[in-house]
């Protein structure tokens, strides 16, 4: 009966903890389950395909359950929406700086574009440079839409200027073409494989999001040699830009198109090109085309031939001293004539464009915001 007579023990309450000691426990109770750990290798793979800050890449992978494809979709959607909003906010800002970018492909195609931004600081930014180069490569690689009428302009002495305006609205919706850093040995122009097609507009929006400035694709032109080529004439494009890191982009840029025909009516140029020394002739013509483009940029060139136009001597390409050809004091016309005579061919400059960042562009509606 001892159990019945034993006095009941006092109820023991838990000892109070100091507030400082209790906080960690309270935080643990209030904190949700830890998010799954994101592998560093997966973050690196995502950033390689879609360059974003580290934290943004980690967030995208967490939200997509570590699914790389889903994370890419998440980033594209969120980045595009954010960039569109920012583009609308900065669209009214002046774009007086930028670059003229040129892309020459395989000695058969050339493209030139004018991409504008707000400040010279951004114009020298690597993101902006890469964007301008990509747009220029795309312009050179793609054909101008077939319904775009060939214009006739005063700077060409021929019926049609072979250099065509490329509508900026068409370029914006075109896929961005990524090409090798240099032409391949066989002259092929195969685009590099990409994980996901990106339009030029999306590329501009991405650059806008990274630079924070208003970007505009102001103008674009391109030339593509006829394919298949005719036996009687070869067209050779050339390009040069001044004031940039390379001779493919700068504050001033110019492109030209040379026609090369045989001096012997009985011997078409095709037989010369495919005969002994033909490769050397083609390489020499390509080098000369670049030199002529450099001449166009180095002088305030406006027209190829004077014709009946009231222009200064230094503005007429064929009348300028060909200073870019080893400092030659003879006119461009005379040098080209002698160059061709030595090789049994006739050279003509049949197309030309010279652009500068500071040009006043008359047709403002052709400016295209990012």
Swiss-Prot record:
<dbReference type="InterPro" id="IPR009060">
    <property type="entry name" value="UBA-like_sf"/>
</dbReference>
<dbReference type="InterPro" id="IPR036402">
    <property type="entry name" value="EF-Ts_dimer_sf"/>
</dbReference>
<comment type="similarity">
    <text>Belongs to the EF-Ts family.</text>
</comment>
<dbReference type="Pfam" id="PF00889">
    <property type="entry name" value="EF_TS"/>
</dbReference>
<dbReference type="InterPro" id="IPR014039">
    <property type="entry name" value="Transl_elong_EFTs/EF1B_dimer"/>
</dbReference>
<keyword id="KW-0251">Elongation factor</keyword>
<keyword id="KW-0809">Transit peptide</keyword>
<keyword id="KW-0496">Mitochondrion</keyword>
<feature type="transit peptide" description="Mitochondrion">
    <location>
        <begin position="1"/>
        <end position="29"/>
    </location>
</feature>
<keyword id="KW-0648">Protein biosynthesis</keyword>
<dbReference type="GO" id="GO:0005739">
    <property type="term" value="C:mitochondrion"/>
</dbReference>
<comment type="function">
    <text>Associates with the EF-Tu.GDP complex and induces the exchange of GDP to GTP. It remains bound to the aminoacyl-tRNA.EF-Tu.GTP complex up to the GTP hydrolysis stage on the ribosome.</text>
</comment>
<dbReference type="GO" id="GO:0070125">
    <property type="term" value="P:mitochondrial translational elongation"/>
</dbReference>
<dbReference type="GO" id="GO:0003746">
    <property type="term" value="F:translation elongation factor activity"/>
</dbReference>
<protein>
    <recommendedName>
        <fullName>Elongation factor Ts, mitochondrial</fullName>
    </recommendedName>
</protein>
<dbReference type="InterPro" id="IPR001816">
    <property type="entry name" value="Transl_elong_EFTs/EF1B"/>
</dbReference>
